[in-house]
């Protein structure tokens, strides 16, 4: 399965961001999600058989895209001395991946929380008229 970055972002947010997955009893109209499930990237949850969640295969598959997005975002942060406002980061996601504001905000929330996997963490330190100021810092692995 080959995805555009925007398709990958959609699936990342569908399967990695709240609410995670798709309910079995609600018809899935999105052909991309149907294909993703059909190819075994998502399966019914072992505990809750009524919901499709990522399989190990799907997690590995999406990780490639998550890593690419995270690495690119870290480079953006390094150019800003690891400090920026939420609104700047959301705008960056919007511009970089041609996303609407809501999708950009969700992706920023997910990626910035997940940066600990790549050795960084986010700390909100003050609120201004431009949003929360955030400091990202390198953490020991």
Predicted region positions:
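Short intrinsically disordered terminal tails
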Residues: 1-3, 95, 138-141
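Short amphipathic alpha-helical interface segments
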Residues: 1-31, 68-92
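Short amphipathic alpha-helical interaction segments
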Residues: 23-39, 101-110
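A short, conserved structural fragment
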Residues: 37-47, 115-126
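Accessory beta->alpha helical hairpin/"wing" motif in late/C-terminal subdomains of nucleic-acid enzymes
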Residues: 47-64, 128
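Amphipathic alpha-helical segments in structured regions that serve as interaction surfaces
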Residues: 72-76, 86-97, 104-115
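C-terminal engagement modules used by replication, chromatin/transcription, nuclear envelope/ESCRT
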Residues: 127-141
């Amino acid at each position: 399965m080959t995805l555009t970055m925007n398709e990958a972002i959609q699936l990342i947010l569908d399967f990695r961001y709240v609410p995670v997955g798709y309910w079995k009893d609600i018809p899935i109209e999105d052909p991309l999600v149907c294909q993703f499930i059909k190819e075994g990237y998502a399966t019914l949850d072992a505990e809750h058989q009524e919901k499709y969640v990522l399989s190990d295969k799907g997690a590995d598959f999406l990780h490639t895209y998550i890593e690419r997005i995270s690495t690119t975002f870290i480079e953006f942060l390094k150019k800003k001395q690891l400090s920026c406002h939420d609104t700047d980061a959301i705008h960056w996601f919007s511009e970089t991946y041609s996303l609407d504001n809501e999708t950009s905000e969700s992706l920023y929330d997910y990626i910035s929380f997940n940066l600990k996997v790549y050795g960084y963490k986010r700390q909100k330190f003050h609120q201004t008229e431009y949003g929360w100021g955030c400091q990202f810092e390198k953490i020991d692995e």
